A protein has these predicted regions:
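The feature captures the beta-strand-to-loop junction immediately N-terminal to the Walker
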Residues: 45-47
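Catalytic Walker B motif of ABC-type/P-loop ATPase nucleotide-binding domains
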Residues: 169-172
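Conserved ABC transporter NBD signature motif
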Residues: 68-78, 86
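Conserved ABC ATPase "signature" region
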Residues: 122-140
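Helix-to-loop junction immediately C-terminal to a conserved catalytic motif
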Residues: 60
Length: 291
């Protein structure tokens, strides 16, 4: 069974009419059909206004479809009686960790969610301990969140989601407010959760180098799913990406520029190590010369 499945997902929203005459209806999602399998690591790309965050909020049942259906582990998100089960199965980490942290001590914040759904006290603290260990924040259990760096706060937010024992986590631009070190801390945690804990990950991002870490990429444009494939398949379609207001990872752009200058490199390079190995091979072949 798919962890996430959408069928003809349509979402409309209303905004004030610019002429001041009531409201007008806009469409954010146009008939999305999507299936996400257990353990997948998917990155969702798209320019501002493409519908990425709107889709994310449907997965966590913060929004429900105008038309069509969203199922999370077989549960229809339009069924209010299933709301807490859905939000337990599919956790969400938002852009600003300060909006997700509600308590004055790290361990209390991580235990807040399980306490709210009635988890017994002895089980709560086991969940808190396990979650903090998984994100590398055990040493900060007694620390006030305001004393943490941005990356540390985001890892606490992730721990709070983990304490709910989700099978899937949606990261909605969760690194966009962080410095490079904080981004790397969070991304390292995300990779480990997917590889070691087999948690399904949906990473919404505008950083191409983050998207390259995923197993599968989805590209959205104007409320539609327009591309679906592996990073190698997607990042070799430079013109298609450009038309959607997107680029390739910096390392891919560098490899492409070198290829255009005559360096014999394969297409579809999107990892630094891969480029370094390819350049080393070229140098060995040419006796130390790059061409």
């Amino acid at each position: 069974m798919s962890v996430i499945r959408t069928e003809n997902l349509i979402y409309d929203f209303t905004v004030p009419d610019p002429e001041g005459e009531g409201e007008q209806k806009n469409r954010a999602l146009y008939g999305l059909d999507l299936a996400v399998e257990p353990g997948e690591f998917i990155a969702i790309l798209g320019r501002n206004g493409s519908g990425k965050s709107t889709l994310a909020r449907h997965i966590n049942a913060l929004l429900t479809p105008t038309e069509g259906t969203v199922w999370i582990e077989g549960m229809d998100t339009s069924q209010e009686e299933k709301l807490w089960d859905i939000r337990t199965a599919a956790g969400m980490v938002f852009q600003n960790p300060d909006n997700q942290i509600v308590m004055t001590m790290v361990e209390e914040d991580v235990g807040f969610g399980p306490e709210n759904i009635g988890v017994p006290a002895e089980d709560i603290w086991k969940r808190v301990t396990d979650a903090l260990e998984k994100v590398g924040m055990t040493a900060y259990a007694k620390t006030a969140p305001h004393r943490l760096s941005g990356g540390q706060k985001q890892r606490v937010a992730i721990a709070g989601v983990l304490a709910m024992k989700p099978r899937c986590i949606v990261f909605d631009e969760s690194t966009s407010m962080l410095d490079p070190r904080g981004r790397e801390e969070v991304l390292s945690t995300v990779r480990e959760l997917n590889r070691q804990e087999h948690i399904t990950v949906l990473l919404i991002t505008h950083h191409m180098e983050e998207a390259a870490l995923a197993d599968r990429l989805l590209v959205m444009d104007r409320g539609r799913l327009v591309m679906d494939g592996t990073p190698r398949e997607i990042f070799t379609q430079r013109e298609m990406l450009r038309q959607r207001g997107l680029s390739v990872p910096p390392v891919t752009a560098l490899a492409d520029a070198l290829r255009d200058e005559g360096v014999p490199l394969a297409e579809g390079i999107f990892e630094e190590e891969e480029l370094a190995d390819a350049l080393a091979a070229v140098c060995r072949k040419n006796g130390g010369r790059s061409r």
